[in-house]
Amino acid sequence: DEYLFRSRVTSAAHLNRDVTILHELAHMWFGDLVTMKWWDDLWLNESFAEWCSYHCRAVICTQDGGEDPWVSFANQRKTWGYTQDQLPTTHPIAADMVDLDAVEQNFDGITYAKGASTLKQLVAFVGQDNFLAGVHEYFVAHEFGNTELADLLTKLHDASGRDLSDFTDTWLKTPGVNVMQADFDVDAQGNFTRFDVVQSAPERFPVLRTHRMG
């Protein structure tokens, strides 16, 4: 009923309906065609479906016009992920699911929004064509089977030639939000004489991550 509009609605409502439908369609591949071996890799279902829904909507907008859905994603979904990642209950995207109670708690902003955000970074890191080629080979190799994180990483490495071990450890297996701050000196004339970008990590998760500034 929520998505059967009976009157004029906002563009945000249309976007929400679109990405919900695209998310569920994505599960035909991420979840149905290939299913994770255990709930540790729940993100292989949900993060991918989340990313795929916004990626597909962005392609539609490029072809037919409309607002970039990644703007809405950054304002709403990514903010949800940031918020949950600063709570005591945060966990890695690729989490250690010790039992089914842990699984139920991890259908959250980390698994959906932060996972999709990190996948967007991964696409930029390996290149979109390489990423899609690697995912295609992942489906071909494991169709109607069960997988884990290493299976996907192998295909992405084969397609891109990029070493993904550091990316995996710092972004997928380490929780928490790092902070980037400007540190600078200004002379008497108001000119910047030094400008550095300093990264800090939460005390609970003291891991610095590679960033590209642009």
Question: Where do the PLM segments sit?
Answer:
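Hydrophobic alpha-helical and helix-loop surface patches within well-folded domains
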Residues: 1-204
